[in-house]
């Protein structure tokens, strides 16, 4: 089934929070692997990036989950470390942080960490394994030589003499197993079995929590707890949500770079095949001749395809099987400080605000065929194919990672074929702004911005049997199920990983209960009996809210 499972993985990782005391921002998130063979999304929900700022973000990885997870782990701190951030210049800080984390992906230390996240062996591990294999071969040969040295001539003849004439004739073109060297283990061994860890619910715990990680096979979370790995810097205010799904061997991301290198070998093999054919006896059937003509036509078509792929290549850009080089991620990051919403985006994930029920896009989808993006790609020496892919590879034009598209030494990072420089949009929040949605393209490829806003708008005021408003995460879960394709027979719509966060700009429940609470205080002064009744009612409502 290619890149898809036989059945979708619909287990969701979900959670809710109410924000920080100084910045109450109720939020809910959910993530689902879906039809994909692995989960490559990640996200951040950090109500207190600092005492005045909240951060929410989604990362949609491609070529592996490692870059998305790395960004979820380190980007929040990198943003805070920027000089511009400390000076209160949040737009500049986001631009600098995106470029800074992208540059870090090329360092040896980070490449090793990415390899560990991805489950790929590092160069050191490969070398050690190679040396160990050579030692094993040497030991086997030494043991065999020692055994033969102690054998009699009769025993040697018995072992080798009978096999002297049993070997197959040597092939003129060189024998082989039919397997390409290095075709196995491109992504290391299969990952560990899926596992989850749950933390107990805390009824009176802190309201500010940070959710950091990716989601694939974990149980639905609660407001105060999620499954995950502790120790992530951005998740110290609360647990994270993380689990690993079994990995299949990685398909070579830069296949189109390799084909031309094999072209000369294929040509030599074709020449040798033709020589062998000429040496065979004459007189074969017309059916065989037709089959040979069909084969020739197929070979010519393959050669034409190879020539087209070779035309797409850029000199000096060899495909490199290295995390951060053949893998990357989109990133959409929203910072909320006071009444200011600042959104940075690189890629095709999206942030949308509901303004009096109307969808307001706070980000642009970066596609290679867009005029601005296409001009930059061509200027960097690349081209966009008919199916909207950069040099036949990526179908987006901005991303963190993907460094084999960023090797033009004559251009700065922001002007490379694939750029990590984000677009920035700023919005001053008013009473008309109800909520914000941040999601990967697994959602936006199925539903438009307005359709998502309408869907949430129709659910956000619904109450459960106890009269409580629905959890935001339950609305997101319903949205994910709505977007999931029934099968994979279509064009891939609804078959992608899905991650979505809903953030409300106003406290939920609190505004509705405040007038009643004030009235009860007045009754307490006027009537002791009324005070007792209302006091008991207050306790019940408080218990529900907690």
Curated annotation (Swiss-Prot):
Which segments show compositional bias classed as Acidic residues? 123-139, 259-312
- Establish whether keyword DNA repair is in the entry: no
The EC code for this enzyme is 3.1.3.16
Quote the subcellular location field of this record.
Answer: Cytoplasm; Membrane
Omega-N-methylarginine PTM positions:
22
Q: How does it assemble?
A: Interacts with NOL3; may dephosphorylate NOL3.
**Catalytic activity reported:** O-phospho-L-seryl-[protein] + H2O = L-seryl-[protein] + phosphate; O-phospho-L-threonyl-[protein] + H2O = L-threonyl-[protein] + phosphate
Q: Where is the lipid attached (N-myristoyl glycine)?
A: 2
InterPro entries documented for this protein = PP2C, PP2C_BS, PPM-type-like_dom_sf, PPM-type_phosphatase-like_dom
Q: What is this protein called?
A: Protein phosphatase 1G
Gene behind the chain: PPM1G
Q: Which residues form a coiled coil?
A: none
Q: Which Gene3D superfamilies match?
A: PPM-type phosphatase domain
